[in-house]
Amino acid sequence: MAIIDNLGQNAKKASFLLAQLGTEAKNTALLKVAEALLAELPYILEENAKDVALAQEHGISAIMVDRLRLDEKRLQDIASGVRDVAALGDPIGQVVRGYTNMVGLKIIQKRVPLGVIAMIFESRPNVSVDAFSLAFKTGNAIILRGGRDAICSNTALVNVIRRTLASFGLDENAVQLVEDTSHEVAKELMAAVDYVDVLIPRGGARLIQTVKKEAKVPVIETGVGNVHIYVDEFADLDMASKIVVNAKTQRPSVCNAAEGLLVHEKVASDFLPKLEAAINQIHPVEFRADDRAQKILKNAQPASQEDYATEFLDYIISVKIVNSLGEAIDWINTYTSHHSESIITRDIQAAERFQDEVDAAAVYVNASTRFTDGFVFGLGAEIGISTQKLHARGPMGLEALTSTKFYINGKGQIRE
């Protein structure tokens, strides 16, 4: 526990200092971090290249390597994201409500930092910076534990941030990286109840399940996206095709990409050939289909029950033909990861029923699921997309990283 004890003690101390830091000071520091990331671009890209080369040596898929890779454009986007967070309103100190009670006590409920956030995540180095910027803006210290495949990139990014904070006389331990990527140390972080106020895992199903099983600290579950699109009998089929192509092929390695397709039986014979032709013009996609869909599609593999429950993160999609809207809703609620789901329909009642009855953080009508994102939702950068109902749900922006505290002022009142 020596590693985690040291990180935890540092983070706890830093969190008390951060909680007292004013909005202007936080924003100034964030803007300087954004500048430093661009100034240190050669160093960061050199370290990232080491991770990419090692990943390629180990035969990691091109899609997963893409998640890992940084270039000048992506680093500019990361720095821009930090500036965007600096421009957002500061939720800390906001009054949720205030009133005077029956005995004259003035009671104010305000937003305050959570304290120490721990984050365990995979592959994407940008998460290090996004998570730091959101935690810092909300007065929280953060302990980051990335994957082995991104250790050089994460180390470089965190080093740049820490040096920048120190140059401003701020506690560099506002952000710390767990450099030991072993499962044993990760398990210690999951059990650090004396230091960690909340743990946020961000990655694939295996990581999420491991954290849920082994964590002793509070957890906000994020990330896994077994996302469906249902093409209703009253859908505009051209619109539906365009949406499915986008949701599946634009960036298949992300959690808001479509993984399952449900099609009403009345439009399946018209829609599936249209979709197959359109999608293959963009990128070949493997269809894993039920018996009825296999008879319509030119190239489809039989789907297993496991396929219907899988987040592929690849150019693969499961396909099922359903008899009714109700069957589609039941199917989705059986297999969903509670992330994002979409219906394509011109029937207003069907759309409303779908949105009311489907159990997911984001439920769309006539739009791609690729929009489930903190920036798109106007929240700024996100620390993750919560697929649970407590303490936050959906894209987690600044407000999700706060708690509340009651401030009570009296004039000598006692309870009788």
Curated annotation (Swiss-Prot):
Q: Which GO terms describe its cellular component?
A: cytoplasm
**UniProt-listed Enzyme Commission number(s):** 1.2.1.41
According to its UniProt record, where is this protein mainly located?
cytoplasm
Q: Does the keyword Amino-acid biosynthesis apply?
A: yes
**Catalyzed reactions:** L-glutamate 5-semialdehyde + phosphate + NADP(+) = L-glutamyl 5-phosphate + NADPH + H(+)
Pathway participation = Amino-acid biosynthesis; L-proline biosynthesis; L-glutamate 5-semialdehyde from L-glutamate: step 2/2
Task: Please name the GO terms of the biological process aspect recorded for this protein, alphabetically.
Answer: L-proline biosynthetic process
| Pfam families on file | Aldedh (PF00171)
Which InterPro entries does this one have? Ald_DH/histidinol_DH, Ald_DH_C, Ald_DH_N, Aldehyde_DH_dom, G-glutamylP_reductase_CS, Glu-5-SA_DH, GPR_dom
Q: Which GO terms describe its molecular function?
A: glutamate-5-semialdehyde dehydrogenase activity; NADP binding
Query: In its keyword annotation, does this UniProt entry include Chaperone?
Result: no
Function, as annotated, reads: Catalyzes the NADPH-dependent reduction of L-glutamate 5-phosphate into L-glutamate 5-semialdehyde and phosphate. The product spontaneously undergoes cyclization to form 1-pyrroline-5-carboxylate.
PANTHER family membership: DELTA-1-PYRROLINE-5-CARBOXYLATE SYNTHASE, GLUTAMATE SEMIALDEHYDE DEHYDROGENASE
Know the name of this protein?
Gamma-glutamyl phosphate reductase
Q: Which organism is it from?
A: Streptococcus mutans serotype c (strain ATCC 700610 / UA159)
What's the gene? proA
